[in-house]
Amino acid sequence: MDTDAIGDLVDKLKAMQNDNVEDQDEYDDVDDDDEEEEHEPITLGFVDKPKNKWSLQRQYFPSKAGGVPAWLDPLNIPSRGSFVCDICGEPLQFLLQVYAPTEQETAFHRMLYVFMCPSMKCLLRDQHEQWKHHPEKPSRSVKVFRCQLQRVNPFYSQECPQYNESHKPAGCGAVLCDWCGTWKGDKLCSSCRQTRYCSEKHQVMSWRAGHKIACPQIQISSPVSGSNKSGATLLESHKGGSKNLWPEFEITIEDESEYNRDMSEENKLSNSLISRNRTDDTMNSIFDSFQGDADKKSWASFQECIDKAPEQVLRYYRNTNAKPIWPLSSGRPSNADIPRCSYCSGPMCCEFQILPQLLYYFGVDNEVDSLDWASIVVYACEASCNASLPYKHEFAWVQIHSPSTAL
C-alpha cells in the first residue's frame, strides 16, 4: 500500500470514527460508570497444545484455534463467495471455533467459526466497510459462521462421544482443498486428477510449493482418473498442505471468577511475564499515541482486567446484558452499529471476544505491516434462530489500535 493510499485510508477511518461519536450517546447505553463494573459471569479461553491430536476432530466437538476447522456439518460447508475475503478475493484463513450449545432443541450442538484474511491491508479496508451503517452487501475480511444441529442428526450419535481414538463420526464429509484443508475442493488438478483445490489461488500456490514435481508421480501411482477421496477416512485426518496455516491449539476454558482473588505482587509479576514479553516493545508507544484521556482510561481498565489472567485469548459472554471490555474508547460500536439478525431480524448479542494475545501464540511477527488488532467482538443472533441455511453469517466488530499506530 503506497504512502498516499495509507494516508487517505487513515483520514477516512478517523472521519468515520469522529462521525460515530454523535451516535454513541444516543444508542450506546454504556457509560463511564458501567465500564467499571462487570456483573455477568464470564468464561475465559486459553490455548494449549492438545495431548492427543484426534481430540480436535469434529466428532469431539472441539473449541480450537489455528490449523483447520472441525466442521460441525461436514457436508454443507460455506462455499462460493462466502469463503473469500471480500476485499482481495482470496480464501479466508481459519482463526478459531467455539463450541457453544444452548438449551434449545435445535441447538443441541452449536458451533461458531471465525475466519479472517491474514492481510493487514485488507483488515484496514475492512475497517472502512465496518463503519458503514448496515450496507446491503457488506465487504468484510473477517467473517463469522454459526452452525447448529439437533441431538438427532445425520452426523453424530445421540450419546456422548467416547474420548478415544477409535470413536468415529457417523457419515462422510465434503472433499476438502488439499492446500488449505478448510474449504470444499471443487477444483480438480487437470493432470493427476487426484489433487483438489478450493480456488485457483491455492492451486497455483500448491503447484509452486511442490505439486509441479509430485503431480507426475501421483499420475503413475494412481492411474485411475478421478479423485478417490470420497470417504470420511481421508477427510477426517486432512490437515492441508499449506505451511501458512496458523499453528493448531486446543481452547480450554476456566471461569474468570477463579482469577478475581487478590494476587500478591510476586504472583502479579510472574503472571504478567507472557504478556509483557509480547508487548513491552510496542505497548508504550501505542499508549503514548492515544488521543486524550478517554483512550488511556479504557486501556488502563482493559489491562487491569487482562492482567488477572494474561494468557487468556478469548472471553466468552453469551448474555444479552454482557458487554465486552474495549481496549480503546474510540472505535467502539454504538448499539446502532450492531445489525439485526439477517435471518429472523431479531437482535444480536455479544457472544465472545478474541484478544490480541492470540497473535503471540500464532507466532505472528510484530512488524509494521503484520496482522494486528486490539479486539474482535463476535455478535450472534440472540435467539440462535434455526434458519434453513446450514452455516449462518453472524457479525464481528474489529477494533484496531489508532489507525496511525496500526499502520
Locate the predicted segments by residue.
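Preference for intrinsically disordered or flexible, low-complexity segments
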Residues: 1-407
